């Protein structure tokens, strides 16, 4: 769509005077839409500058809340309970706290324990949940609120539901007779039919004569009923992408878990059962080569087997009987295996020997091997009795977890496809409630697979030399290979059944890794499930939240190969010792399975006869809370005697070693390689390491390391990082004051501890990320304490504030970096956010809920302000200050009694602000990266300060000291400057900083002086404004400022912050009645506007001052919508979305539910009306075409009147609207389109943005007090009021209901992001938002469209986008969307109607009311013409009746088109399927007639318009129901009969005559409905109806336009053009009779060159021009401008049809009119179009480039066709239509109409003998015909166009033989030529024309031969003379001419017809003519051969010689035939014979 068509309503604005207009606006506030809004007229403050806000607190003091009535009181001030302190108990997963009990804890452990049990301290803003940040309006919440909406009834939906209504019950197969031959039903029967119909119900009050005021009141009351309270609940939710203010409260810190898998061990069975077997489960990651879980020990032995160990066992603890385990996997991978190891009781023999029975003996052979089994059982019993406490490795296997979780049962796990040496398992899937489909995309996800039961059947025996984890990883890697080495091993056969499933959310009977009971734990006696601790494959960054202190000991290997003696069966015992006495072993080692919970010692499995065993054992220990220097692990090595020998002990100690657990205060972990002592360690050994060579001790292998062991701690107490350890140690030393203290090699004293602490603070940045994140809460707490509680050393305060602050910045940065992947959209780290929200508390305070205790006096003191502090912050303080505390004027080293008070007075927020302001550049950079954290910390500190000190009652101005506020000012200025300077370098950081600053200021609004915060906002705005002037890319800055404003406005008390209750608004007055309107001041009268009201509706200085935040937001919107705004498209969306989001929030906020409150809230947005009104030219045009809307504003604009108004704004679409049909896209041009709007209006808004803005406008109109709107309307100028009406018009178009079918068709794609939006948004982003460039470019590369320019108008592309990107919705969802859309359309229209009523009341008695009311009526008419619900139409028609009743002159004395338009609308609704609509439409139409009659005792105008409307309506509306229209006619008749007021007049009689007349017209024209699917018949009917109105030019013109529209719809542009030419001729004929102007056509004759058919328009009757008759030829088409419009449309259609020559003829008639009007612009355009037309003619001279049409003769035969029987037509079909195509189309159409097996196509072209046809069938004969021209015509028809235009005669030929065959031998082959003449020349106003004359000529065989030879000769001549020559074509023609042919070649023709001289003298002439033809043929062959010889190459010489030989043979054969002479040839021929010869051959020669 061209810009000029899109913005028709703005055409009247004159660009040349734009500067003057701007000046005038700044002086006079005239409100031109294109004047700059940058100057606010009230105080002269430009919009680009921020006004000084009011002092908020002072304003509130001067206006206490009690001053407001009732509910408005809550809008004045924040609620008293706005801020509260919550102590939320920390969530504990276990039933026991799990913290150390009654132990003397050191400072570090105590601090950790306290942290893990203390409550969360939460500062709660009680109403924050109501803000847009925390309670967003989303699609889901909207849907919830939309429940219970009433269903609106729409005509288009009703018509779809009632297809089987009476109107469709007629027999669709009845004859399609021609209407012109069908007699009209008699008047008597028509009257009878109408009288017998039932009328609809009558409106009881219609015939009452009520006062207008009463009618208005009644209408308003009815309109107010059952309205939805929240308009925007019906509108789609705000765009989530724009919601920069979106926040969510962080999740409380919780223990980290990965994806959890539940493994249940069900049973373990071997072929033989002789001894107990014990199992171990663990997870291993092969890729990472890491064990990723602790061990789970299970015991599935039977009681009898367990009984064998009774001698060694104690009563097993319930926790060791677990058979289920929950494993956690943080990093799922396809390389994870569940490894199952089996152990057995130690026995004599190596592992292979012990496994042999299990591999050899089978259960089926039990009887055969009974003795062996008994022997084995006996041996096993002995070993269990003696060696029961020792274990030995037995077997192992592994399950590949990825196969389990990814397969859906496809794997056949019963089959051992990879051989017997591979572990086999079967998989049985349980299909139950937990059955979940596996994700095919993510095969490694362990969270959503189907539970599986595995049966593991094969185990591998353990190999003594390959027990280490390294060997295990090799085995596991090998298992995945097809050629596994394990296949060659013999398996240990067993059956282990295990269940693997996703772990449930809250499993019952679950134990933590510390064996604590996890909630819920219903019964302590139930068999537990164990949570297995994960050892993540990679780092996991999560803070510790609970106490955990576990130590894992992994003995790896022992090398006793050099040890002398019998040391072979080695076992390692481990003990946790608190001292050196054997009794000091602590019971902290976790038991395995079926044993006690904790033990004092544990042993490794024994490898038989191995002096250098490897171990896979894992010992798990519970570390004591306090680990001291004496705590150590003692390892004792035993030789175990497997065979009982007399005098030999069971176990012999053969070595000792140990590991001290604490060294320099740090827990020792990691790998160790320890020497082993042969002797027992000496006293005091525990404080030393074994590496120290103690005197007198013997060591294995000369004190070398022979025992490899590894310690791993999982502790939330011990950081295990040197830098963190040192930091915590130093802090706790300072807290305890325990000097001196040894730290590694350094002895800390009071003198050097400060230096060490500073170094430790600086070194924190070197800490490992994982422990730093884990202990981040501890670290941050300590740093906060150091900032605000500086330690005292030797009586001196150590100023560590800066160092601690810098350390805090680095720690936060490290934590951020580590958790980068987990950050939210705003770059916040969830863990840090959770720390601030939950964990942070002010050190030294015990938070409790304030309960009236006296406030603690706290002085505001800050640390020293360094030299980096800006000079502006000193505020002229001259007092000398202490280096550590600025409030102390004392020497730094002095000790004062007030030190304790000072220490208690440091406030974190003050220190943070100060340190930030004075920080160095490096630190500041780190802080800026994560400014949000420090801002939130500061805010929480301030809130705690107020809450704990009970300062909330303190006036806000006194809550915080001035110095702190100065620091805040400097800080905000500094951060704001960073935002501005970084926006072009690091956009992402700038965005995050901008948002952080906005949220900080928003938070401050709840805590400090709000006027102070507003001043900060203003300062920031000024900073941005300053930079904007020099910015290379202002759009980026404007975007950030927009987001900044949006965040500020998301505050939960946004409305209160805008001071809504202060007296800027005028006092409300009651809505005036008609009688009281005179007392009001009105712009239409001489009084001046009310400045108070004006300032409320404009972005005036007072408005922006008082409503500061609303002013900022609306100012941003106004600036973004300015035509010259930078980055407009992106800013439009952002600004409009911000307003929309706020209004949605108001609609859903329960605080504003009452109408009075919401009205006060709406006042904050009143300038939105002016903004939208002025933005009108750039809003998306939702109307189908310009229509009425383009003329509302201009009609009221006084500047457009006068001579410049040549445009008269005639628009053909107006007439088409009356006719009920749309024009073709190219036909909307008006004579006065003016300059293209886009160049003037700037960047147009997208459809989505425009619609959202209009929804916001409607919200304001709906919720504002009507009296206030009325006073505003009173002050508007006429142009402003016109633009307001334009806006309302656009609202109606934007929210028009699309119908259920539209939702089904596009699956609810109502204003979602189209490709157009996406492309433009990307463009905007690429220009402004640098951080997103890569993403956008990538998405663009993937786009199938490449360059997205001009995508806006690529409808096909947009359609593709809609259908391909949509998410398919269910029928219920589409039903719901249609329901909501219907309610939205209804409510939007009702709001518009309410506003129109207000405007009508405003201008009722003004001087300019006619022009305003005319525009109002146009909007009302548009609303009635669009798709509306029955509910709205009731109210809309009531308003229309009231309007026409009060101002009848609008319709009957002013604009004719208004009356025509109204009649059309009412008549359409009279035909509605919905009875209520018909009732109201009938009432309106009746009242219209009555009012017209009361004015002049005649209603000729209404009669004429209703008649015209009915004709148009029935002719063009498809879903029109004539039955319902008849009922409405009956209803009107009933009104006339019951109206007593006009009983004595002729009114009732006239109404009756009109109704009967309409009824008859309806009956006549209703046939058109039957032929909607038959385009030819439909056009014929329209043509005949138009011809029937030959005496009524208005109606004929209407029908011609209808036909043009239909033709355009069908793509028949030539025919559409002819319709417009006929219409223009009709108008010209009328104008020529009315007045004589030289520049006008003289009538139809002037158009004869365009079409000879046009002369039929001259039949115009004189009485039409009678001035006495009202309403005839009164349409605007019957003017010069109307004629111009019709001619332009004709030219447009001709151009589209490729008939460029006709375009010239049209413009020949148009140019003189334009010259007479001196419309040079239009003339330039016309000549440009002529140039284009002529250029195209030149380039398409051959004619092949444009094919004009194909013609067919179609004959209809049979009674089924009715009046078409035996009729012949010539059909014009699209170019290159084949005979088969039209045959198929017609056959298919009539088959559908008449039924199967009825229609037959006659295949030949022979004359049809009807007597031979089946009377029950319908026959169609179709023949291809060609245009025929006489010889004299060909002289004039030179060009291809000439031979395809103005065609009346057509020819077709039919071959036949005397015996009836089509083809036969040459002597009997005849040909019939048929000439057809049509009534009119093609192209005509229809595509089929009746044949009016037929002439046939029969050719004899010789004449046929003559024609054939002439044709061959012409072909030869053409091929020979072709330039450039075409050798191939020439040879082809030659070959066909001289080559030997099978039959009917030239030689055979000659032999047949020339061999003998005919006996009949009549044939002599034909004989001679054929002879001459052959002579000419031979000559042409010779010429062709000569030409061919010149063209060929050497390779074709032989071929040419062959052609010459053939030619010679042909010539020789022809020679005797051609030399015969006819003796009587020259004899005189009788006259009669001469004539017959002429007749027979005259027209055939050149065919």
From Swiss-Prot:
The modification Phosphoserine is found at residues 178, 872, 880, 884, 1308, 2036. Widely expressed. Expressed at low level in spleen, cerebellum, hippocampus and in substantia nigra. GO terms for cellular component: cytosol; perinuclear region of cytoplasm. The keyword Phosphoprotein applies. The modification Omega-N-methylarginine is found at residue 865. It is found in: Cytoplasm; Cytoplasm, Perinuclear region. InterPro entries: C2_Dock-C, C2_DOCK-type_domain, C2_domain_sf, DOCK, DOCK_C/D_N, DOCK_C_lobe_A, DOCK_C_lobe_C, DOCKER_dom. GO terms for molecular function: guanyl-nucleotide exchange factor activity. Residues 32-42, 1071-1089 have a biased composition (Low complexity). PROSITE patterns: C2_DOCK (PS51650), DOCKER (PS51651). Keywords: Cytoplasm, Guanine-nucleotide releasing factor, Methylation, Phosphoprotein. One of its GO terms (biological process) is regulation of Rho protein signal transduction. Residues 548-714 form the C2 DOCK-type domain. Residues 1587-2023 form the DOCKER domain. Residues 20-42, 136-190, 213-254, 410-444, 1068-1090, 2025-2047 are annotated as: Disordered. Residues 20-31, 160-174, 213-223, 244-254, 411-427 have a biased composition (Basic and acidic residues). The DOCKER domain may mediate some GEF activity. Acts as a guanine nucleotide exchange factor (GEF) for CDC42 and RAC1 small GTPases. Through its activation of CDC42 and RAC1, may regulate neurite outgrowth. Belongs to the DOCK family. It is linked to Adams-Oliver syndrome 2: A disorder characterized by the congenital absence of skin (aplasia cutis congenita) in combination with transverse limb defects. Aplasia cutis congenita can be located anywhere on the body, but in the vast majority of the cases, it is present on the posterior parietal region where it is often associated with an underlying defect of the parietal bones. Limb abnormalities are typically limb truncation defects affecting the distal phalanges or entire digits (true ectrodactyly). Only rarely, metatarsals/metacarpals or more proximal limb structures are also affected. This is Dedicator of cytokinesis protein 6.
């Amino acid at each position: 769509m061209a810009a000029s068509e899109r913005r028709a309503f703005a055409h009247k604005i004159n660009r040349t005077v734009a500067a003057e207009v701007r000046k005038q606006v700044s002086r006079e506030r005239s409100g031109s839409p294109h004047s700059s809004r940058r100057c606010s007229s009230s105080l002269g403050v430009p919009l680009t500058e921020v006004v000084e806000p009011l002092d908020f607190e002072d304003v509130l003091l001067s206006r206490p809340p009690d001053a407001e009535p009732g509910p408005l009181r809550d809008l004045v001030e924040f609620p008293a309970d706005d801020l509260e302190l919550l102590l939320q108990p920390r969530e504990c997963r276990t039933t026991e706290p799990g913290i150390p009990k009654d132990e003397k804890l050191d400072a570090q452990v105590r601090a950790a324990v306290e942290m893990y049990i203390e409550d969360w301290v939460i500062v709660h803003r009680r109403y924050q949940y109501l803000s847009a940040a925390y309670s967003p309006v989303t699609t889901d919440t909207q849907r919830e609120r939309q429940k219970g909406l009433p269903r609106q009834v729409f005509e288009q939906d009703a018509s779809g539901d009632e297809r089987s209504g009476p109107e469709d019950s007629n027999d669709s197969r009845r004859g399609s007779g021609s209407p012109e031959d069908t007699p009209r039903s008699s008047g008597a029967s028509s009257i009878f039919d109408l009288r017998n119909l039932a009328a609809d119900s009558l409106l009881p009050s219609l015939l009452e004569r009520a006062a207008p005021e009463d009618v208005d009141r009644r209408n308003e009351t009815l309109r107010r009923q059952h309205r939805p309270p929240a308009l925007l609940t019906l509108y789609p939710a705000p765009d989530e992408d724009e919601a920069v203010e979106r926040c969510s409260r962080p999740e409380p810190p919780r223990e980290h878990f990965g994806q959890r898998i539940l493994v249940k061990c069900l049973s373990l069975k071997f072929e033989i059962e002789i001894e107990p077997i014990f199992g171990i489960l663990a997870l291993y990651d092969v890729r990472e080569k890491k064990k990723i879980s602790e061990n789970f020990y299970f015991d599935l032995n039977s009681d009898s087997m367990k009984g064998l160990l009774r001698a060694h066992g104690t009563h097993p603890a319930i926790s060791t009987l677990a058979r289920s385990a929950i494993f956690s996997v943080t990093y799922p991978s396809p390389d994870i295996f569940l490894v199952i190891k089996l152990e057995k009781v130690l026995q004599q023999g190596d592992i292979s020997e012990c496994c042999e029975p299990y591999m050899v003996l089978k259960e089926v052979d039990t009887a055969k091997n009974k003795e062996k089994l008994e022997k084995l059982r006996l041996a096993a019993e002995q070993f269990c009795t003696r060696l029961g406490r020792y274990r030995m490795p037995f077997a192992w296997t592994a399950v590949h977890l990825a196969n389990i979780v990814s397969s859906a049962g496809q794997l056949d796990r019963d089959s051992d496809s990879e051989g017997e040496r591979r572990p086999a398992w079967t998989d049985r899937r349980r299909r139950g409630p937990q059955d979940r489909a596996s994700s095919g995309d993510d095969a490694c996800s362990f969270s959503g697979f189907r539970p599986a039961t595995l049966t593991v059947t094969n185990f591998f025996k353990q190999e003594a030399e390959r027990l280490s984890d390294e060997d295990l990883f090799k085995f596991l890697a090998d298992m995945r290979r097809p050629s596994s080495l394990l296949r060659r091993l013999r398996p240990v056969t067993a059956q282990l059944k295990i269940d693997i499933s996703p772990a449930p959310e809250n499993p019952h009977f679950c134990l933590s890794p510390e064996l604590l009971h996890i909630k819920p734990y219903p019964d302590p006696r139930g068999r537990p499930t164990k949570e297995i601790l994960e050892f993540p494959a990679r780092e996991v960054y999560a803070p510790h939240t609970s106490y955990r202190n576990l130590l894992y000991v992994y003995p790896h290997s022992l090398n006793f190969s050099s040890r002398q003696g019998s040391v072979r069966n080695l076992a390692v015992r481990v003990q946790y010792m608190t001292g050196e006495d054997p009794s000091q072993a602590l019971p902290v080692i976790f038991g395995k399975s079926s044993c006690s919970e904790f033990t004092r010692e544990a042993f490794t499995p024994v490898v038989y006869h191995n002096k250098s065993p490897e171990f896979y054992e894992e010992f798990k220990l519970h570390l004591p809370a306090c680990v001291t220097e004496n705590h150590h692990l003692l390892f004792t090595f035993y030789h175990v005697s497997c065979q009982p020998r007399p005098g030999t002990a069971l176990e012999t100690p053969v070595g000792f070693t140990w590991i001290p657990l604490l060294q320099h205060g740090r827990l020792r972990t990691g790998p160790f390689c320890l020497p082993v002592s042969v002797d027992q360690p000496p006293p005091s050994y525990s404080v030393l390491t074994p590496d120290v060579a103690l005197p007198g001790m013997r060591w294995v292998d000369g004190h070398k390391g022979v025992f490899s062991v590894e310690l791993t701690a999982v502790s939330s107490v011990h950081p295990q990082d040197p830098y963190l350890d040192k930091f915590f140690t130093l802090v706790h030393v300072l807290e305890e004051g325990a000097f001196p203290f040894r730290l590694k090699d350094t002895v800390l004293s009071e003198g050097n501890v400060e230096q060490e602490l500073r170094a430790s603070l600086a070194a924190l940045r070197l800490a490992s990320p994982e422990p730093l994140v884990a202990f981040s809460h501890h670290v941050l707490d300590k740093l906060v304490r150091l900032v605000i509680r500086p330690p005292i050393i030797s009586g001196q305060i150590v100023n560590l504030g800066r160092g601690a602050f810098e350390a805090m910045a680095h720690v936060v940065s490290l934590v951020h970096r580590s958790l980068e992947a987990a950050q939210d959209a705003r770059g916040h780290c969830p863990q840090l956010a959770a720390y601030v929200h939950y964990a942070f508390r002010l050190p030294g305070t015990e938070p409790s809920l304030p309960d009236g205790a006296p406030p603690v006096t706290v002085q505001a003191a800050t640390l020293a302000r360094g030299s980096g502090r800006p000079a502006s912050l000193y505020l002229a303080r001259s007092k000398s200050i202490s280096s550590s505390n600025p409030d102390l004027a004392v020497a730094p080293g002095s000790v004062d009694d007030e030190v304790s008070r000072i220490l208690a007075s440091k406030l974190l927020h003050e220190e943070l602000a100060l340190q930030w302001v004075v920080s160095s550049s490096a630190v500041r950079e780190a802080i800026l990266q994560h400014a949000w954290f420090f801002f939130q910390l500061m805010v929480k500190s301030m809130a705690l300060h107020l809450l704990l000190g009970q300062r909330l009652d303190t006036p806000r101005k006194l809550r915080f000291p001035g110095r702190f506020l100065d620091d805040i000012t400097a800080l905000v200025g500094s951060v704001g400057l960073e935002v501005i300077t970084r926006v072009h370098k690091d956009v992402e950081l700038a965005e995050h900083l901008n948002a952080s600053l906005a949220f900080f200021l928003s938070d401050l609004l709840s805590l400090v002086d709000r006027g102070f915060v507003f001043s900060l906002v203003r300062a920031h705005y000024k900073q941005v404004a300053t930079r904007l002037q020099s910015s290379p890319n202002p759009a980026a800055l404007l975007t950030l400022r927009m987001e900044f404003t949006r965040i500020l406005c998301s505050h939960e008390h946004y409305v209160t912050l805008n001071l809504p209750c202060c007296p800027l608004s005028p006092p409300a007055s009651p809505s005036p009645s008609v009688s009281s309107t005179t007392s009001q001041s009105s712009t239409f009268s001489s009084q001046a506007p009310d400045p108070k009201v004006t300032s409320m509706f404009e972005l005036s200085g007072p408005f922006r001052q008082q409503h500061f935040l609303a002013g900022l937001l609306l100012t941003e919107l106004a600036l973004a919508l300015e035509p010259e705004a930078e980055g407009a498209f992106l800013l439009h969306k952002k600004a409009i979305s911000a307003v929309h989001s706020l209004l949605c929030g108001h609609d859903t906020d329960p605080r504003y539910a009452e109408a009075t409150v919401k009205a006060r809230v709406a006042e904050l947005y009143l300038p939105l009306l002016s903004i939208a009104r002025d933005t009108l030219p750039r809003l998306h045009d939702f109307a189908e075409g310009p229509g009425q809307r383009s003329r509302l504003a201009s009609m009221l604009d006084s500047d457009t009147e006068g001579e410049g108004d040549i445009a008269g704004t005639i628009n053909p679409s107006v007439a088409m609207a009356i006719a009920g049909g749309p024009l073709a896209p190219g036909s909307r041009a008006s004579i006065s389109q003016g300059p293209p709007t886009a160049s003037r209006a700037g960047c147009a808004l997208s459809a989505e943005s425009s619609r959202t803005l209009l929804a916001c406008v409607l919200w304001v109109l709906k919720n504002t007090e009507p009296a206030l709107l009325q006073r505003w309307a009173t002050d508007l100028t006429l142009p402003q009021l016109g633009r307001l009406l334009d806006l309302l018009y656009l609202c109606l178009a934007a929210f028009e209901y699309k119908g259920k079918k539209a939702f089904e068709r596009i699956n609810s794609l109502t204003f979602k992001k189209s490709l157009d939006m996406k492309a433009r948004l990307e463009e905007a982003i690429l220009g402004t938002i640098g951080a997103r460039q890569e993403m956008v470019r990538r998405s663009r590369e993937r786009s199938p469209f490449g360059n997205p320019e001009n995508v806006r108008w690529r409808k096909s592309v947009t359609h593709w986008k809609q259908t391909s990107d949509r998410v398919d919705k269910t029928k219920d969802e589409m039903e719901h969307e249609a329901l909501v859309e219907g309610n939205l359309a209804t409510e939007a229209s009702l709001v518009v109607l309410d506003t129109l009523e207000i405007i009508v009341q405003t201008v009722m008695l003004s001087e300019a009311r006619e022009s305003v009311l005319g525009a109002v009526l146009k909007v009302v008419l548009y609303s009635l013409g669009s798709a509306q619900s029955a509910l709205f139409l009731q109210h809309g028609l009531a308003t229309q009746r009231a309007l026409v009743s009060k101002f009848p002159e609008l319709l009957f004395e002013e604009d004719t088109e208004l009356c025509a338009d109204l009649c059309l609308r009412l008549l359409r609704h009279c035909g509605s399927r919905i009875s209520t609509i018909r009732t109201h439409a009938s009432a309106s139409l009746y009242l219209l007639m009555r009012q017209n009659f009361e004015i002049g005792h005649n209603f000729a105008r209404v009669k004429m318009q209703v008649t015209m409307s009915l004709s148009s309506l029935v002719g063009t509306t498809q879903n029109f129901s004539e039955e319902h229209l008849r009922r409405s006619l009956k209803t009107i008749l009933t009104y006339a009969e019951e109206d007593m007021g006009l009983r004595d007049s002729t009114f009732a009689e006239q109404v009756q005559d009109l109704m009967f007349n309409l009824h008859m017209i309806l009956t006549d024209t209703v046939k058109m409905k039957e032929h909607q699917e038959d385009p030819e018949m439909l056009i014929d009917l329209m043509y005949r109806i138009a011809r029937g109105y030959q005496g009524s030019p208005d109606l004929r013109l209407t029908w011609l336009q209808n036909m043009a529209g239909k033709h355009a719809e069908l793509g028949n542009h030539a025919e559409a053009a002819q319709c417009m030419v006929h219409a223009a001729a009709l108008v010209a004929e009328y104008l020529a009779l009315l007045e004589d102007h030289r520049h006008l056509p003289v009538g139809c004759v002037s158009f004869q060159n365009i079409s000879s058919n046009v002369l039929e328009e001259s039949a115009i009757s004189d009485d039409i021009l009678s001035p006495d008759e009202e309403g005839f030829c009164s349409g605007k088409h019957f003017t010069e401008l109307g004629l111009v419009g019709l001619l332009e449309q004709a030219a447009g259609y001709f151009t589209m049809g490729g008939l460029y020559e006709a375009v010239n003829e049209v413009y020949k008639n148009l140019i003189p009119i334009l010259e007479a009007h001196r419309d040079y612009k239009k003339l330039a355009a016309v000549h440009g179009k002529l140039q284009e037309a002529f250029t195209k003619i030149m380039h398409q001279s051959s004619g092949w480039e444009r094919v004009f049409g194909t013609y067919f003769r179609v004959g209809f035969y049979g009674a089924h066709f009715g009046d078409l029987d035996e009729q012949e037509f010539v059909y014009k079909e699209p170019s290159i239509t084949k005979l088969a195509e039209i045959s198929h189309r017609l056959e298919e159409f009539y088959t559908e109409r008449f039924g199967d097996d009825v229609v037959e196509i006659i295949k030949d072209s022979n004359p049809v003998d009807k007597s031979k046809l089946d009377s029950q069938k319908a026959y169609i004969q179709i023949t291809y015909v060609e245009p025929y021209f006489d010889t004299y015509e060909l002289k004039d028809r030179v060009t291809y166009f000439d031979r395809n235009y103005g065609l009346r005669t057509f020819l077709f030929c039919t071959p036949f033989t005397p015996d009836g065959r089509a083809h036969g031998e040459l002597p009997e082959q005849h040909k019939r030529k048929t000439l057809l003449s049509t009534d009119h020349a093609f192209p005509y106003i229809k595509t089929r024309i009746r044949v009016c004359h037929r002439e046939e000529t029969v050719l004899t065989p010789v004449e046929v031969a003559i024609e054939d030879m002439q044709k061959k000769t012409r072909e030869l001549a053409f091929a020979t003379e072709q330039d450039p020559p075409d050798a191939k074509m020439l040879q082809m023609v030659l070959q066909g001419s001289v080559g030997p042919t099978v039959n009917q070649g030239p030689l055979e023709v000659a032999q047949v017809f020339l061999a003998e001289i005919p006996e009949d003298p009549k044939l002599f002439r034909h004989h001679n003519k054929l002879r001459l033809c052959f002579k000419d043929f031979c000559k042409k062959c010779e010429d062709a051969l000569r030409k061919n010889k010149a063209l060929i190459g050497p390779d074709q010489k032989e071929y040419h010689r062959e052609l010459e030989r053939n030619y010679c043979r042909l010539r020789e054969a022809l020679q005797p035939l051609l030399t015969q002479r006819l003796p009587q040839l020259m004899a005189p021929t009788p006259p009669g014979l001469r004539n017959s010869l002429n007749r027979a051959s005259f027209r055939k020669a050149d065919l």
